[in-house]
């Protein structure tokens, strides 16, 4: 009998094709167990993390009972604010504040001492302790805080607050000193332990300080090892130890067995007779580590401590060890005995300052007082000279070459000539050229760069580049001639503006009292006596610049060239070298460059050289420029160029510019200049207005001096009383009537001079709407022959 296997029954034997079923069940069971264990482990880890977080949160609360109060500091502040509002009789404000701040406190109830808690909407708030004061603790606290804050910040404060603050400072200083002594004692103990010499000694810092001071007091502890080598311990790096020697640990007598501390030399400090039981409220000054009061004075054998705050005149007391140099004080009345001082100090000119380096050494500098030289009108003190602007009543402070404009400068003529040397590109009397680095530099900027050199001997030769003729205080005349040296190649500082100086031949006859200046050939001596009038033997004296009634353009000139007229050949001889551009980074002080004698004998140059011309160039970048020039009795002869005829403003004849051969020479050269036929104006008040000079040519004027209506850009007409000065009929074509020395100002609009001694008035020439030439810079030549040094009153560029 056989049985068939039915696969439908689950408990039947599985076929041979499925042998893996049992093993699969086992794997599934194991995986389920593993997942269960992993989930349990993750749950345990999460629980542990949560417990750690709770412990970290709850641990500070358990350890610090005041942490909750600190965390609720805002609630504490709100309580004090509520208390202040309540005691200030601000009931409504207190109620509104309590409602907004969620304060569970009765509106009319005063705070009491102690915590108080109430329930509100299920929330329990623990209030901090509120101090009960009559006007509110917040108000009283604020009063005390503000008073002490003002005292500590040196803003005042009450007397009690100042006393309290001083007591606090004194306690802090004493604590600082004690801490420094404790650090020193600990260092000594550490060094002794390192050497094996420490035997459990306890060193009191105050006893150690007393031993350092040499006070006869018992040591802090019984010293052991009496046979110890008493050698001081050098400690490098400790400022306290470096300032005084350390006494031995035990200086005992082996025969007697007793310990006796040998007193050391008392240092200089504020701990005189300080013991452990004495009052330590001595006069301490703070900073005990670096300004330690116990510094030795081993040279004082007496044994008395020297206090730094007292005056000790004994010769044995010397300064402490390692005294810094910065602590040495010197009063203003203390003067060194061995330092030579000069009796008079004079600021040098721009050329003499560049002679060489100043010798090293301490030299007392004193300011020389100038009581006689008068620079500006109505001024009797030359300590701060002023330059009066023509046409105005205001005066400007003159920077006349002093270092910081503090030293009186009366040699204005020397300054002016130095200014001409610095601003001039070449010399019209010599072939030497100035330094390229000094082109466009002002003398005041150069003076500020070079230090003032003390004049040791006032009787020595002057370092000025020009002859000095002056009068001393006793009335004697002395002429001192010095040799000029060209300034070195030195970088100078930039200066925005430099006031110009108006120079007249005689400064004593200026009745208008507006311009007080000096001649080019006159320079006061070191005693600053009033200048004396001398005849100018130069055939072509230096052109004088005046102050501008409007600020000068700060841009530099493009270039400047000079030439000389040769009377033998009748030619204008140009100087060596091409035109040299002025440094564009240095602002020019005036739009006119002047060439003056630079080297050689001045007298020989006066007799051998003849006048030349000056090329005026407008500032760079100006397409339309108005050149406003005021001349005084001068003859203007230009080079041979194209001319432009202009109309007279009063409808007169046309003034024609003429070019011809020079009658003084038979050579037909194109550079030869000749004086044309004289054209006299129809009246003394005839004026000429030049309005459109369109090219780089110049006008050849007759050998006369004319005056024109000077129309400024503000359309102001400066009409002067013009006169004509014809030349002499002799062979000298360069002779002109010299103007009076009192010509120093430009007459205002519709105003004539009332000075009877004024022979020649200001000659006004206006060049308007000067055009630029394509591919060229503007080049306007004004050949000034036989001009007086007072010819130019002012020059104003406007664009």
Curated annotation (Swiss-Prot):
Naming one, the record's GO cellular component terms include: nucleus
- Supply the PROSITE patterns for this chain: LISH
Cited SMART domains: LisH
Q: Where is the composition biased (Polar residues)?
A: 1-10, 270-285, 318-340, 371-396, 460-480, 584-593, 660-675
Residue ranges for the region (Disordered) are 1-22, 37-68, 101-127, 255-406, 431-501, 568-621, 644-691, 705-758
Question: What does the UniProt record say this protein does?
Answer: Required for diploid filamentous growth, haploid invasive growth and flocculation. Putative transcriptional activator of FLO1.
Give the primary localization class.
nucleus
Q: Which InterPro entries match?
A: LisH
Q: What gene name does this entry carry?
A: FLO8
- Please give the coiled-coil regions recorded for this protein: none
Keyword Cell wall biogenesis/degradation attributed: no
Lineage of source species: Eukaryota, Fungi, Dikarya, Ascomycota, Saccharomycotina
Instruction: Write down the superkingdom of origin.
Output: Eukaryota
Q: Where is the composition biased (Basic residues)?
A: 354-370, 482-497
Give a yes or no for keyword Transcription regulation in this entry. yes
An example GO BP is: regulation of biosynthetic process
> What is this protein called in UniProt?
Transcriptional activator FLO8
Instruction: Provide the protein's localization.
Output: Nucleus
Compositional bias (Low complexity) at which positions?
41-55, 307-317, 341-353
């Amino acid at each position: 009998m056989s049985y068939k296997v039915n696969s439908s029954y689950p408990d039947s034997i599985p076929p041979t094709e499925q042998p893996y079923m049992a093993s699969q069940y086992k794997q599934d069971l194991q995986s389920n167990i593993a997942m269960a264990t992993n989930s349990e482990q993750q749950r345990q880890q999460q629980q542990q993390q949560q417990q750690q977080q709770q412990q970290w949160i709850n641990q500070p609360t358990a350890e610090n009972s005041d942490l909750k109060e600190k965390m609720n500091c805002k609630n504490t502040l709100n309580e004090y604010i509520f208390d202040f509002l309540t005691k200030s009789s601000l009931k409504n404000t207190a109620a509104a504040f309590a409602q907004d701040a969620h304060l569970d406190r009765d509106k009319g109830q005063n705070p009491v001492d102690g915590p108080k808690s109430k329930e509100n909407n299920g929330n329990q708030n623990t209030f901090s302790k509120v101090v009960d004061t009559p006007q509110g603790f917040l108000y009283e606290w604020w009063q005390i805080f503000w008073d002490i804050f003002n005292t500590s910040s040196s803003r005042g404060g009450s007397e009690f607050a100042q006393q309290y603050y001083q007591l606090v400072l004194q306690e802090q200083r004493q604590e600082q000193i004690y801490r420094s002594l404790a650090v020193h004692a600990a260092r000594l103990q550490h060094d002794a332990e390192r050497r094996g010499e420490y035997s459990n000694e306890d060193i009191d810092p105050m006893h150690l300080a007393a031993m350092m001071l040499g006070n006869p007091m018992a040591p802090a502890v019984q010293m052991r090892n009496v046979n110890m080598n008493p050698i001081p311990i050098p400690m490098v790096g400790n400022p306290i130890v470096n300032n005084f020697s350390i006494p031995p640990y035990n200086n005992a007598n082996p025969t007697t067995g007793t310990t006796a501390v040998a007193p050391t030399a008392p240092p200089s400090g504020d701990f005189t007779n300080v013991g452990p039981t004495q009052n330590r409220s001595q006069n301490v000054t703070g900073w005990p580590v670096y300004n330690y009061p116990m510094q030795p004075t081993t040279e004082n054998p007496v044994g008395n401590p020297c206090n730094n705050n007292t005056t000790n005149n004994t010769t044995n007391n010397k300064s402490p060890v390692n005294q810094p140099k910065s602590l040495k004080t010197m009063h203003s009345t203390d003067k060194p005995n061995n330092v030579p001082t000069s009796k008079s100090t004079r600021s040098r000119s721009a050329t003499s300052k560049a002679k060489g380096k100043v010798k090293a050494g301490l030299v007392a500098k004193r300011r020389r007082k100038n009581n006689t030289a008068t620079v500006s009108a109505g001024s009797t003190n030359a300590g701060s000279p002023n330059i009066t602007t023509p046409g105005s009543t205001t005066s400007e402070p003159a920077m006349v070459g002093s270092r910081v404009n503090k030293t009186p400068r009366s040699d204005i003529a020397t300054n002016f000539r130095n200014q001409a040397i610095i601003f001039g590109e070449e010399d019209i009397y010599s072939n030497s050229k100035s330094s390229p680095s000094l082109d466009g530099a002002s003398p005041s900027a150069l003076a500020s760069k070079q230090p003032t050199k003390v004049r040791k001997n006032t009787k020595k030769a002057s370092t000025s580049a020009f002859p000095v003729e002056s009068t001393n205080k006793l009335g004697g005349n002395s002429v001192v001639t010095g040799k000029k040296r060209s300034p070195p190649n030195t970088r100078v500082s930039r200066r925005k503006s430099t006031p110009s100086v108006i120079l007249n031949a005689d400064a004593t006859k200026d009745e208008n009292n507006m311009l007080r200046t000096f001649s080019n050939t006159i320079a006061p001596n070191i005693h600053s006596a009033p200048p004396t009038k001398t005849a100018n033997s130069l055939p072509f004296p230096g052109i004088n610049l005046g102050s501008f009634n409007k600020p000068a353009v700060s841009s530099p000139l493009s270039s400047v060239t000079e030439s000389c007229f040769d009377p033998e050949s009748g030619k204008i001889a140009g100087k060596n070298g091409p035109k040299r551009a002025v440094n564009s980074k240095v602002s020019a002080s005036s739009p006119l460059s002047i060439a003056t004698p630079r080297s050689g004998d001045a007298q020989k140059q006066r007799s051998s050289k003849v006048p030349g011309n000056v090329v005026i160039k407008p500032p760079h970048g100006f397409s339309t420029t108005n050149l406003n020039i005021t001349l005084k009795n001068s003859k203007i002869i230009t080079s041979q160029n194209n001319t432009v005829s202009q109309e007279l403003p009063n409808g007169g004849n046309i003034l024609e510019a003429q070019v011809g051969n020079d009658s003084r020479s038979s050579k037909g050269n194109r550079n030869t200049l000749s004086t044309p036929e004289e054209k006299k104006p129809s009246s003394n008040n005839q004026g000429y207005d030049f309005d459109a000079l369109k090219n780089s040519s110049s006008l050849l004027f007759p050998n006369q001096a004319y005056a024109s209506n000077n129309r400024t850009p503000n359309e102001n007409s400066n009409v002067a009383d013009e006169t004509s000065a014809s030349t002499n009929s002799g062979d000298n074509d360069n002779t002109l009537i010299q103007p009076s020395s009192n010509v120093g100002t430009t007459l205002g609009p519709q105003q004539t001079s009332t000075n009877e001694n004024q022979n020649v008035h200001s000659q006004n020439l206006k060049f308007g709407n000067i055009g630029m030439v394509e591919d060229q810079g503007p080049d306007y030549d004004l050949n000034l022959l036989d001009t007086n040094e007072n010819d130019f009153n002012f020059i104003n560029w406007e664009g």
